[in-house]
Amino acid sequence: MADQNRQIKLAAAKKKLKEFQQKTIPSTGSAGPKKKRKVKGDQTDAPADRRSPENERVDVSQELEEAGAEHVSNPASAINTDNSAPQNYPADANGDEHPLENNRPLSSTESLRQLSQQLNGLLSESSTHINGDSDPPAVNEKELETRNQELSAALDSSALTNTQLTSKLETLTKQSQELSDQLQKERKEFEQKFTKEQGAMREQLQVHIQTIGILVSEKSELQTALSYTQQAARQKAAEAEDLSSRLQASKQRVSELERTLSSVSTQQKQHERHNKELEKERDSLRLEIIRFNNVSEESRQQSSELSEQLKLRVNENSALKLELEDLRKRLEMADVMLQQFSSQSGPPSEHQQLQLLLEEKHQLENHATQLMESVAQLQAERDQYAVQMQEDGRVWKDKTEQLLSQVRLMSEERDSTAAQILELQERIMELENTAAVMSTEQEPQASSQLSGPSETELALQETLRSLQEERDALSLQFQAQVRDNEQLSRLVQEQEVKLQELERQAERASEDAQDRLRILEDVQSDKATISRALTQNRELKDQLAELQNGFVKLTNENMELTSALQSEQHVKKEIARKMGQLQEDLHNAKEQLLESSSELTSVQEQRDQYLAHLQQYSAGYQQLLAEREHLQKQFLQQTQLMDRLQHDEVQGKVQLEQSHMQLQEVQEKLSRLVRDNEELKTEVQELLNGSIMNTSHRDEGDGLESQTLPESFQKSQIAIPEDFESREEMKEFIHSVLSRVEAERDEMSRRLEEERRIHQDTRQQLTALSHDHHHHHHHEPHSTCAETDGSEGVPVEVHEALRVAMEKLQERFTKLMQEKADLKERLEELEHRCIQLSGETDTIGEYIALYQNQRAIMKQKHVEKEQYINMLAKDKEEMKTKLAELQDLVMRLVGERNEWYSRYMSAVGNRDLLNSNAEQIHPAERRMEISGVDAPAVLDMSTAMDVSSSPQSSTAEIQSQSSERPAADPISSPSLRPQEDGTARQIMQLLQEIQNPQSRPAPFLGENPCIPFFYRPDEHDEVKILVV
């Protein structure tokens, strides 16, 4: 506060100096605010300069200089400044306000006077400085009074502020002292707490150091264990990789088998479709057979009619032949007569008659030549017509076959489209069901999502639309195919109508031919035509019989196939049942494995607390290989249990060593007791030697003394080996140690019993001696004084020592027995656990061996399945090739038949021409020749076997017939028959190979040669495969 007053005063003086220098009179209103502002500014600056001693020194020196200057310049005011200086400077130097308050008991008038003197001094100093004169100028007193009043008011306000500030300063000093006291207390408490915490932290540090050492040792052990486990894990990982590769290969093989099974199922479906088509063809062939039967009946009727007509024509021919013979005879007679008439000259009338007869002969010859030409033309026309009929029949057959193939294709396409439509309908139903399920699931979400349908709904709607479009397109295709089928059926009907018309035309043509043949009554070729018609009828009958036999065989084959399929299905059902049983057995075995593993884990969880750190290190690795390493965990846990057993064995060794040490201590105590007993015995012997009256007791005592214990026990030394080669060796060592310890225990107990007995005998001797001594004391008191004192003092001490030793021995022996019993129990527990672990390892090994055996069996069956499937594929390819060969041979046989038939037709035509000039041959012989030549071309399955089995008889017949015929006959040469026999033989051989293939049963199925799969088509002709 003193600094502030001094600064205020100096600022006011400087302002006055400036005002007087400018020769202006400042207003009172402007000075007050400036002072107030300065005061405020000084108050803000005061706390910063309050505690700085350098600023105080500077201010004091400045004030002294100013005071000196004022004293020199104004001697009148020097007194006032000197009086006021001792009041202000001490406060400025010390920074205290209390001296000011104590040295200021002045009144307001004195203060005003001092202020006026100071102002006068200042004014005089300023005037001297300005004018250079020593005389002060005259000042207005009123102004000075007003100035003094203002200054007094300012001083009063400053005093008030000083008092307020001093009170605040006192309160602040008190608060600072309280805070400093609290701070010291807190420092002391903090130091105490810090020392305590430091001690605790040091203790914790030591504990942590110890735990760190333990953990480092454990870490080294765990690292070694972890290295072993990592090696085992790597081995098991390699094994797992091998197993995974094998599993992937087996999966691939299973997928391939599924593919083959699907292909087999598709092939079976195709076979079923083919069977259906064959059944349809069989029905159509039956219809054709019925039609052919009708045609054959009609042909029979026609043949009967033709035979009747032939008989009539034969009669007519015979009549004509008779007439011709008559005419020939007449001609011969006429010739004879002409010769006679030529030789004899006769009248001219006879010559004219001869000429007339010659003319008639020429006319008859011309007429015969014309008839022969017409017959030849009719035969040629007949042959052409037959060829045309055959060509037309072939063309119509080809057309009908093409139409049938088209119909089959269309029916197959219709079936496929129907199946596709059914599949699409099923898919649509499934999608509708899924859409319904999704709609039911999304109903609660619909309330929150009212803005629009979800993406899944839009996708489902799009898929439904696309499927509906596909269904519409397929329905349109189906309708178009149905229309095409209808059009094709119409075309077939039209073709059938055309065929009927052509047949009618053929019948008409045949009728025309019959009409023409009626004209040719004299022609002998009718016999050949009739025989040919008969042979054709026979061929048709043979063909019908062959067709019937073929259909019978087809039906038999179909029945055999159905029976084989049923047997295969039955065998497959049995195989599926067996596989199901095997699966159940495997499942039971897996459950047993899981149960055994769960038991192992439950047994091992009790011991897992010691391996918590190891499990933390190997937790991540075990989680990744948990599914594949159950057996690894079991083996690891077994090794851990063996390590624990070894650790327990080491602990047992330590305990055995401790027990040996204790036994040694007990032996030392026993030796001490023996020594004490010997000392007691010597003392007793001395007492007995000193006693003269009781010789008998001494002899007994000598007898008892003769039964002395050995001087010292041999220390039992048990050499514990560092390493055991096997667990059995460890067990044998522990059993031997226990037997030795038990023997030592028995020996010690025996010795203890002997000591007790000796002790009791000595006590009895001592009591007897005391009685004798007491009895002898009455007779000889003087001689036995010292001896009685000795006999009364020694037995009590000996008794107490022996009692203490016996108690100690009993306690020690009880402790040893208890420890040995505990060791025995612990060893029995360890043996029991070892036996359990060995049994569990054996069971695990058995399970592993069983699993490997089953896996090897399944692998072998899998290989055999593959071999059998490959064999079936090869058989199928061979069957295809054989069928292709059979088809080629049948086509070759048909071509050969057609060629032979055409040659036969041409030969028959040439024979008719030749037979017109040849001699008459009996019709029976000719019929025999025709039947010998005209053998059927298409053989039956059963008759062809007979033909192929007896080729020599047929060749002999052909040779005999050829020998009977003339050599110039081109038809009688059997050049075509052996070729047909060769093709028929090849066909029969192929049929035998197809019907009776080489039976190669699968080795894994036994006697039932069937595919080892179980499949069954459901309602939608879908095969559900059960892969075992």
From Swiss-Prot:
Coiled-coil portions: 162-200, 233-388, 414-690, 738-769, 799-840
Pfam family, one: GOLGA2L5
Polar residues bias: start-end ranges: 74-87, 945-964
Listed GO CC annotations: cis-Golgi network; endoplasmic reticulum-Golgi intermediate compartment membrane; Golgi cis cisterna; Golgi cisterna membrane; microtubule; spindle pole
Keywords: Cell cycle, Cell division, Coiled coil, Cytoplasm, Cytoskeleton, Golgi apparatus, Membrane, Microtubule, Mitosis, Protein transport, Transport
One GO BP annotation of this record: thigmotaxis
Membrane topology of this protein: Peripheral membrane protein
Subcellular location: Golgi apparatus, cis-Golgi network membrane; Endoplasmic reticulum-Golgi intermediate compartment membrane; Cytoplasm, Cytoskeleton, Spindle pole
Loss of function: phenotype: Morpholino knocked-down fishes have smaller brain and significantly diminished motility compared to controls, in association with disorganized muscle fibers. Morphants die between 3-4 days post-fertilization (dpf). Other organs such as eyes and heart are not affected by golga2 knockdown.
Entry superkingdom: Eukaryota
Amino acid composition bias (Basic and acidic residues), ranges on this chain: 40-60
Leader peptide range in chain numbering: none
Keyword Cell cycle: yes
Matches recorded under InterPro entries: GM130_C, GOLGA_cons_dom, Golgin_A
Ribonucleoprotein found in the keyword field: no
Region (Disordered) location: 1-112, 259-280, 756-791, 944-981
Role played: Peripheral membrane component of the cis-Golgi stack that acts as a membrane skeleton that maintains the structure of the Golgi apparatus, and as a vesicle thether that facilitates vesicle fusion to the Golgi membrane. Required for normal protein transport from the endoplasmic reticulum to the Golgi apparatus and the cell membrane. Plays a central role in mitotic Golgi disassembly. Also plays a key role in spindle pole assembly and centrosome organization.
Similarity comment: Belongs to the GOLGA2 family.
Protein name: Golgin subfamily A member 2
Organism whose genome encodes this protein: Danio rerio
Lineage of producing organism: Eukaryota, Metazoa, Chordata, Craniata, Vertebrata
Gene: golga2
